[in-house]
Amino acid sequence: VGGTGRYVALVDFNTNATAADAGWQDVSTEAGYTAILTAINDLKPDGGTNLDDGLQNANLLFAKSNVQEIDSKNIIALTDGEPTYYMTKDIFGNPTVGGFGNSCTKEVFEAAANTAASICNSGTTLYSICFGAANEEVKNPNTGAYISLFEYLNTYIALNKTYSANDFSGLTDAFDAISSSITSGLSSGTVHDSLPDGVTCISGDFEGNRNLTGATGEPGEGGVTTYTYTK
């Protein structure tokens, strides 16, 4: 059965990051939902937190052909601790993991923040969830002061789009809030229309954009709303 095109992919990050073999799945279909759920259940905890590499790998997934044309692109970064690794290059220019794995150094702090800024500047919306570690402290290399992990994420990773959760209920609430934010952003768009047969534009007054007013929407099957308006 065809879905509504709600594509989800999963990236696991610890010492480094790996995209799940499931790739992009349309979770509005039973098969796609099951594939992503299986990938989530297959996750195993491991050492370190390479948030930088996790964000980079998530962003690379948007280059896949089945999602390239989708306008609304979102990344949700879920972490249970401060970042402790980052991506750098060795003496030959090859990508390698940097950091000590037990603390958020200046390089780790800035690498994840710079990657997040680059992602947001490209038009992708970035959310983060701090799970069970909101009060964990991270040293801000710019000031020398310690800030909470929540503040770091909410200021340098997902600006004003960070949620805190301490248990399963809180995690569910966070994802519900993010889902609501994502879907509410789909309520606007651009309509390209043409003049009916027998009507021509002489003065050019129809050129440019026009606001669509007086449109009425009627929800239909599969969450699709049809808007009707009069020219």
Question: Predicted segment positions?
Answer:
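Short regulatory alpha-helical segment in sensory/regulatory domains of signaling proteins that mediates
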Residues: G2-G3, N66, I182
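Von Willebrand factor
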Residues: V1-V27, K73-T79, T124-A133
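Short, flexible, mixed-charge acidic loops at enzyme active sites
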Residues: G23-Y33, T143, L153
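Extracellular beta-sheet repeat scaffolds used for adhesion and glycan interaction
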Residues: S28-A31, A35-N41, F92-S103, F206-K231
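C-terminal "exit" segments of structured domains
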Residues: K161-T230
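Generic structural signal for alpha-helix termini and adjacent loop/cap motifs
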Residues: L61-S65
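VWA/integrin I-like adhesion module and closely mimicked acidic/polar interface patches used
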Residues: D42-T49, D53-L60, I70-N74, T79-S181
